[in-house]
Curated annotation (Swiss-Prot):
InterPro entries (UniProt xref): AB_hydrolase_fold, Peptidase_S10, Ser_caboxypep_ser_AS
Lineage: superkingdom: Eukaryota
The name this protein goes by in its record: Carboxypeptidase S1 homolog A
GO-annotated biological processes: proteolysis
Length: 652
């Protein structure tokens, strides 16, 4: 999901923002020039910023691709400098598999996943120090976090002076030729990307083309990763429900072209040996998931009622009415099939039709929920949600951290340029060549494992819609999967973390008491699910070898809806300067703007905020805790805050 587009800069004193926020000079990086193309290079630096386990290495860096019209089959007259953060596995990295991690957006940084969900460390509330995450996904797997497409996070096209408004949550290109303006609580300065919407991928398919070229360079020429295990997996989240299927199927198609000698260019013939696609709370296809946006706020396992049955029914009628959401989605897809068959998004007529479908579906589906003032990413939380806390933004603003990373740009966890580019062509309304559910089917037929994992408190990409996707696939195992029942996910001797339907290589899991970013809410459960899938074990128990038992299927109930949940207490409010629009009250925003707010470690201490009201419920829905002995992480976990202006088209 989308976060505030804040640029992280230094704020070292309480109640002021006087320090200049530009990154320090880049020093001490290793430069590796490609043996295939003199204009391609990798720059990187080893550090222990987050992973502090003795003997476990980690590296930050960029893969630099020059402007080149031939790279992607589309006009690419801009440099691509793609950021990565690589963590070796804590156990046996030489023989461990590797997983790529991608957040969604479109335009969200994968640092969200690293620091808020499954990376080696949590950021403490001082925004300066870290705590080891014992449930890190790099315990047994090499992890590669990538900021993509171009201009996302630490990735950039050209270094550009910028200002950031904490009040309006916007980045603007700045001219500092007459001097750098003084910083204050509401206006910060830094170095970022050009902010040009055309200087990045403009749709999911073009992003797939771009990331494949990154992978060709990184896996062949990054000198610090020479494993015995060449398996590669992709795990992703949210808008990654589109990224993951599209990217993985594109990788698989390119593998086939390399094998049959359709691709013969030197430096582009590395087989990416795909093993697993994992999607967490994925927004995959509106045709399957649209109705869940009407149903979930009214009918969920927490007894929360964001609106009435009459409102729910009206939304569904709007979706199905002539010239409604479904009609416009169909028109977009037909227009794209005829007018943009190669998915370049360079046909203005098709772009306009699909952008209208994208916008209208947002309107039908999202506006009724906005009135409830509930969290998009956690329906049990208020809209101004301090959980997960966004302390990683301040952490990544430290000059010492930027220096250790070797980054020439400040951190921005959301790219306005990418968001504008994708939404301008109506990317969320479009499919790719097979459609994203078709991609999943293709991967399953190709022997790739696919796991759909959904937290049951998320609204924006909720589990009801995810379940519909899982049941709507058309592949050789469709009927066997549908006949499989739901089994308990046994996390430890005292805790059941969710329910899973699995047949062979395909699974759908509902994770209890988790919002959008499942690993941040339920780190132990998420790690068990992740490792069981990665190492070919059944998700329910982790005891059966699925590689040796391809006909394995879970047994149990047909539905999970009978398992109800208790509403958790509302989190204590925390107004965080670098997520002000998503965590602060109007009074606090006014204090930030006029400079009267008292700030300590980016947290607004005065004026203070009062705790929000609990969500509305209905007495007709029984509630019961799904199990005892919850393995939820209590602290310190770094998570996200959302924007009150979020719409369906923005995802993490």
């Amino acid at each position: 999901m989308r976060l505030a587009a804040s640029i992280a800069v230094a704020l070292p004193v309480i109640g002021a923002a006087s320090a200049q926020g530009f990154p320090p000079p880049v020093m001490g990086v290793t430069v590796v020039k490609s043996k295939y193309d003199e204009n391609v290079k990798i720059t990187y630096k080893e550090n222990d910023i987050c992973e502090t386990t003795e003997g476990v290495r980690s590296f930050t860096g960029h893969v630099h691709l020059p402007p080149d019209n031939d790279y992607f089959g589309v006009y690419q007259n801009y440099s691509i400098n793609t950021f990565f953060w690589f963590f070796e596995a804590r156990e046996d990295p030489k023989n461990a598999p590797l997983s790529i991690w991608l957040n969604g957006g479109p335009g969200s940084s994968s640092m969200i996943g690293l620091f808020q969900e499954n990376g080696p460390c949590w950021i403490n509330d001082d925004s300066k120090s870290t705590t080891n995450n014992s449930f890190s996904w790099n315990n047994r797997v090499n992890m590669l976090y990538i900021d993509q497409p171009n201009q996302v996070g630490f990735s950039y096209d050209e270094l550009t002076n910028i200002t950031y408004s904490t009040i309006n949550d916007t980045i603007s290109v700045a001219d500092f030729s007459s001097g750098v303006p003084a910083q204050n609580l509401s206006t910060l300065v830094g170095t970022g990307s050009s902010q040009k919407p055309w200087a990045t991928a403009n749709n999911t398919v073009n992003a797939a083309r771009s990331i494949w070229h990154f992978a060709q360079v990184w896996f062949q020429e990054f000198p610090e990763h020479k494993p015995n295990n060449n398996k590669i997996s992709i795990w992703t989240e949210s808008y990654g429900g589109r990224y993951g299927p599209s990217f993985a199927s594109y990788f698989q198609e390119q593998n086939e072209k390399i094998k049959n000698h359709t691709i013969t260019k030197e430096g582009e013939m590395h087989i990416l040996n795909l093993d697993t696609l994992g999607v967490i709370n994925g927004c995959i296809d509106l045709m399957f998931q649209a109705e869940s946006y009407a149903e979930f706020p009214y009918n969920n396992t927490y007894g929360i009622t964001a609106y009435t049955k009459e409102k729910r029914d009206a939304i569904i009628r709007d979706i199905h009415r002539p010239d409604g959401c479904f009609d416009k989605l169909a028109k977009c897809r037909e227009a794209a099939k005829e007018g943009d068959p190669h998915f370049y998004s360079n046909n203005a007529t098709v772009n306009a039709i699909c952008a209208e479908a994208n916008s209208d579906c947002d309107k039908y589906l999202m506006e009724p929920f906005q009135e409830a003032n509930l969290g998009y990413y956690d329906i049990a939380h208020p809209l101004q949600d301090p959980f997960p806390p966004p302390f990683f933004k301040g952490f990544l603003s430290q000059s010492s951290v930027l220096s250790d990373m070797g980054s020439p740009v400040n951190f921005s966890h959301y790219s306005q340029a990418v968001g504008k580019s994708f939404h301008g062509v109506g990317d969320y309304a479009r499919p790719d060549v097979r459609g994203f559910t078709g991609d999943i089917a293709y991967l399953l037929e190709s022997g790739v494992k696919v796991a759909l994992v959904y937290g049951d408190r998320d609204y924006i990409c909720n589990w009801l819609g995810g379940e519909q996707v899982s049941l709507g696939l058309n592949y050789t195992g469709t009927e066997a999967f549908r006949k499989a029942g739901y089994a308990d996910v046994k996390v430890n001797s005292s805790y059941v973390g969710g329910l899973v339907r699995q047949h062979g290589n395909f699974s759908f899991t509902r994770v209890f008491e988790a919002g959008h970013e499942v690993p941040g809410y339920q780190p132990e459960t998420s790690l068990k699910i992740f490792e069981r899938i990665m190492f070919n074990k059944d998700i329910a128990t982790g005891e059966l070898d699925i590689a040796q038992k391809q006909d394995y299927g879970t047994t149990g109930t047909e539905s999970t809806f009978q398992v109800k949940n208790e509403i958790p207490p509302s989190p204590e409010p925390t107004c965080y300067l670098l997520s002000a629009d998503g965590t602060c009250t109007p009074e606090q925003l006014n204090a930030i703007e006029n400079g009267t707010a008292v700030v300590e470690n980016y947290i607004i201490k005065s004026p203070a905020a009062s705790k929000g009201n609990p969500p509305p419920t209905t007495t007709s829905s029984p509630t019961a805790s799904p199990t005892a002995g919850s393995a939820m992480l209590k602290a310190p976990v770094a998570m996200l805050a959302i924007s009150a202006l979020t719409v369906l088209a923005f995802y993490l």
